[in-house]
Amino acid sequence: MKNIIPKDTRYIPFTQQNSCCVPTSINIVMYKEGLPLIPQELLGYYLGLILEKKYKKLFWDVRTGKRPPAGYGTQMQKKQFEINSIFKKLKIPLKVTPYPIKYFKNKKELVLFIFDKIKRNKNLIVLLASDVLNKTKNNNGHACVIDRIYPAKDLIRLIDPSAVQPKWREIKIDKFIKAIKSHPTGQGRILELTRIK
């Protein structure tokens, strides 16, 4: 029988609402961890979600305004939207540990880090430049869940919440690294989400 989805996937993909890649990626992890889900729009709001005015009608209530440097979406880099504080506020039993791309000395170190985390069934979300993944010129940040890494094949598989991209995306590791380094605000990083008791 043909594989309809990857046999070794660790996640059930979800599809994002406009500009909600971060909260949707978090919900993908929450579902895997057996945690109660909350609407991506609500989680996004608390993480500083801001939209272009023309998309306001897609939401019950949302901030609109000037386009931030990384594009429309969440604003976790601002103190009032810091992810661990928001998780506490919303009683989400997860803790985020960020790993900026500069944390890794080279490709080998990054690959070993991801490989080890996946081997131990840890949850990783990557913040990167969508332009590198999608061959566009929109200057937007994007978030995906890291599903698997295959060092021998030089591939990494992401769960992409975008409505217009494949849910399971395999890309070359060098392209993955370039996408992280090319994040529009230099905030490209890997977030490890750990369940807290």
What are these regions (language model features)?
Residues 39, 100, 129, 170-172:
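Short, solvent-exposed coil/turn linker segments
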Residues 46, 50, 86, 117, ...:
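Residues that form generic nucleotide/phosphate-binding pockets
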Residues 66-143, 147-149, 194:
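Predominantly the structural core of cysteine protease catalytic domains
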